[in-house]
């Protein structure tokens, strides 16, 4: 014969199981890395395996390809890393390190998974031609010069327009 107490106990267990069912998908979602986080984790692995003296840091990340929603499916990635001033033996994060002037640039391609618990990567990096690094520096410097010139032109236009306004004499 069931008692009222048994009914409350069964109701509590049902409630606990229902809450667990609602919370578990949230825990799984929280363990999925973003595309960039997965690439940064792969770069950490590259730095650990590297025999080079200094750490590498993300220089350029190619746009994220269209992907399925399964975090366990390997996702294609391609990015460029550049040598930093920080020695590989440091405990410092590569993101906190400045790029080394004329540092080695590597082009990396492969796959990463976004599952944080079982995250994996298969990346290979090739030394980029020096021309590529110089080209990147050229574009960066050109952008700075164009920005300065643009500001100067805007200021000259403003000055010209101010001079067009009729002046009233007091």
From Swiss-Prot:
GO terms for molecular function: lipopolysaccharide binding. It comes from the Eukaryota. Gene3D superfamilies: 3.10.450.10. Coiled coil: none annotated. Residues 31-131 form a propeptide. Disulfide bonds join 86-97, 108-125. GO terms for biological process: antimicrobial humoral immune response mediated by antimicrobial peptide; defense response to Gram-negative bacterium; defense response to Gram-positive bacterium; innate immune response; neutrophil activation. The keyword Transcription does not apply. InterPro entries: Cathelicidin-like, Cathelicidin_CS, Cathlecidin_C, Cystatin_sf. Proteolytically cleaved by proteinase PRTN3 into antibacterial peptide LL-37. Proteolytically cleaved by cathepsin CTSG and neutrophil elastase ELANE. After secretion onto the skin surface, the CAMP gene product is processed by a serine protease-dependent mechanism into multiple novel antimicrobial peptides distinct from and shorter than cathelicidin LL-37. These peptides show enhanced antimicrobial action, acquiring the ability to kill skin pathogens such as S.aureus, E.coli and C.albicans. These peptides have lost the ability to stimulate CXCL8/IL8 release from keratinocytes. The peptides act synergistically, killing bacteria at lower concentrations when present together, and maintain activity at increased salt condition. Residues 1-30 form the signal peptide. It is found in: Secreted; Vesicle. The keyword Secreted applies. GO terms for cellular component: extracellular space; vesicle. Residues 150-162 are annotated as: Active core. Keywords: Antibiotic, Antimicrobial, Cleavage on pair of basic residues, Disulfide bond, Immunity, Innate immunity, Secreted, Signal. Antimicrobial protein that is an integral component of the innate immune system. Binds to bacterial lipopolysaccharides (LPS). Acts via neutrophil N-formyl peptide receptors to enhance the release of CXCL2. Postsecretory processing generates multiple cathelicidin antimicrobial peptides with various lengths which act as a topical antimicrobial defense in sweat on skin. The unprocessed precursor form, cathelicidin antimicrobial peptide, inhibits the growth of Gram-negative E.coli and E.aerogenes with efficiencies comparable to that of the mature peptide LL-37 (in vitro). The cathelin-like domain (CLD), which is the propeptide part, does not seem to exhibit auto-inhibitory function, as it does not inhibit the antibacterial activity of antibacterial peptide LL-37. Belongs to the cathelicidin family. This is Cathelicidin antimicrobial peptide. It comes from Pan troglodytes (Chimpanzee). The lineage of its organism: Eukaryota, Metazoa, Chordata, Craniata, Vertebrata.
């Amino acid at each position: 014969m069931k008692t009222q107490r048994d009914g409350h106990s069964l109701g509590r267990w049902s409630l606990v199981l229902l809450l667990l069912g609602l919370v578990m998908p949230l825990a799984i979602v929280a363990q999925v890395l973003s595309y960039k986080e997965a690439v940064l984790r792969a770069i950490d692995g590259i730095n650990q395996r590297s025999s080079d003296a200094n750490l590498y840091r993300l220089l350029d990340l190619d746009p994220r390809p269209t992907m399925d929603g399964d975090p366990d499916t390997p996702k294609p990635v391609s990015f460029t890393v550049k040598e930093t001033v920080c020695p590989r033996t440091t405990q410092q994060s590569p993101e906190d390190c400045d790029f080394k002037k004329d540092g080695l640039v590597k082009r990396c391609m492969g796959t990463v998974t976004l599952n944080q618990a079982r995250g994996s990567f298969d990346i290979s990096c090739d030394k980029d031609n020096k021309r590529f690094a110089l080209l990147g520096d050229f574009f960066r410097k050109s952008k700075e010069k164009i920005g300065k010139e643009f500001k100067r032109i805007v200021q000259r236009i403003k000055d010209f327009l101010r001079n067009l306004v009729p002046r009233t004499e007091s």
